Amino acid sequence: MHNDKDLSTWQTFRRLWPTIAPFKAGLIVAGVALILNAASDTFMLSLLKPLLDDGFGKTDRSVLVWMPLVVIGLMILRGITSYVSSYCISWVSGKVVMTMRRRLFGHMMGMPVSFFDKQSTGTLLSRITYDSEQVASSSSGALITVVREGASIIGLFIMMFYYSWQLSIILIVLAPIVSIAIRVVSKRFRNISKNMQNTMGQVTTSAEQMLKGHKEVLIFGGQEVETKRFDKVSNRMRLQGMKMVSASSISDPIIQLIASLALAFVLYAASFPSVMDSLTAGTITVVFSSMIALMRPLKSLTNVNAQFQRGMAACQTLFTILDSEQEKDEGKRVIERATGDVEFRNVTFTYPGRDVPALRNINLKIPAGKTVALVGRSGSGKSTIASLITRFYDIDEGEILMDGHDLREYTLASLRNQVALVSQNVHLFNDTVANNIAYARTEQYSREQIEEAARMAYAMDFINKMDNGLDTVIGENGVLLSGGQRQRIAIARALLRDSPILILDEATSALDTESERAIQAALDELQKNRTSLVIAHRLSTIEKADEIVVVEDGVIVERGTHNDLLEHRGVYAQLHKMQFGQ
């Protein structure tokens, strides 16, 4: 099996073809139009022979009467075919790019969390936008040039051989030399194109970091650092572009030099008496004009090669992502609503790409309807435990059970439907407040249910003050809201979801003391009759938990109730003393 980076242009295009095939009707129409367009140019040149031999050579004035009409007709045909071909190719190109982007977008949504841990957002955005657009270049502008100029070359060759095969046969020597030159340049174009795509991802990442962290940049005076970083990747992109221009600029004169040598040799051969006797003024003019006309399509084909190779390199990059293994969803068990029993048995887990396990031999039972709190220092593994319940990652050893069945037995959709998550890193969408609360299920919930969830999360106070209430668009990631307001929207979302298992990962971390007190009552109500896993730094929020589990360096070191752990005077007692000074 070939690696994508080793695929030839032909193999890459063959793989792209199934994406293009549904729109081949547009390609056929465009191809016919392009061939007619090239034929009109070739036929225009062929008119030189009757014009010189008959119109002027024999003073046959009838040629000068009908020829202007033919020229006008050919120009009209040329204009129509040019429009039809451009429109059809652009239509096909747009469809192909949309299809590729949808496939890429859908495939990325099915990728495991570990995939996104390794990739920068800017690079992935570049794949969906820039690389997909490069595919358009290969399937639109490049294709137009290849078909039109290819048809022109074939037409000119046929016409030259028809009028003087002796002179035209010399050009056969030209074909393999030009082919070798194009192949060498193609390899160079593709290598540069791959580097340009990677660099474009770095440019996007640099810009994205500045835009998302512009407040931090301003506060910490990072303008110079960010400017230097962006200048560095931008200059790298410029250098790659210059390499592309250099390769293209060198290939043009090489191709033209080869063609010029062939033309010079033809001119020399035409001086031989045996050849000259068979030529008329019109014939030799048509042959020489055709040879000169060959320069343009040869140059265009050489130039379009750079564009085509960029598209093929982009295809390979996209295929690399599309070939990446998606999240494993091999479970068959579907459950409408779980009871909520969760159990970890001898679970060991290591993050992909790391050597040291994040969790070691975790044994933990969370009975249905009970609340278990995880505490510990930052990086101890608390959030990792929570992420394993939703199977964002698969464990190395042991098993995790829900209602007595291994999580891997459930379909991912069914499993995740049992869990509501409120984390410290709330993500909101550039949509209305109502649609954010009822995210992905706007048609399932009534307006009254959405309002009730917002009220229980103590969010209606600030929502009612907005211009359009629940219909207010809150900007990208809730940029128009405060941290506490964003957190309450997320809690309202969890309330509305009404899942049997609840994960609260620092759910009140962004709230002020007053808001925290107000919302704690709602969280207490939410946790009733639900299996709750609460992760908290503020120990005051988990004192009423049925069990508190202390995690240190990926290992459970203590467990018990709040009072039991204080009496034990272990790690939990130390953490409590640090927070409350007792």
From Swiss-Prot:
TM helices/strands, residue ranges: 63-83, 140-162, 167-186, 253-273, 275-295
One GO cellular component from the entry? MsbA transporter complex
Q: How is its activity regulated?
A: ATPase activity is stimulated by lipid A, hexaacylated lipid A or Kdo(2)-lipid A. Inhibited by the phosphate analog vanadate.
The protein's enzyme class: translocase
Q: Which residues form the ABC transporter domain?
A: 342-578
Give GO BP annotations, semicolon-separated: lipid translocation; lipid transport; lipopolysaccharide transport; transmembrane transport
- The segment(s) forming the ABC transmembrane type-1 domain are 27-310
Q: What is known of its domains?
A: In MsbA the ATP-binding domain (NBD) and the transmembrane domain (TMD) are fused.
Q: Any miscellaneous information on file?
A: In addition to ATP hydrolysis, may utilize another major energy currency in the cell by coupling substrate transport to a transmembrane electrochemical proton gradient. In vitro, MsbA-mediated ethidium efflux is dependent on both the electrochemical proton gradient and ATP hydrolysis. Identified as a drug target. Inhibited by a series of quinoline compounds that kill E.coli through inhibition of ATPase and transport activity of MsbA.
Q: What is this protein called?
A: ATP-dependent lipid A-core flippase
* Species this protein is from: Escherichia coli (strain K12)
According to the entry, what is the taxonomic lineage of the organism? Bacteria, Pseudomonadati, Pseudomonadota, Gammaproteobacteria, Enterobacterales
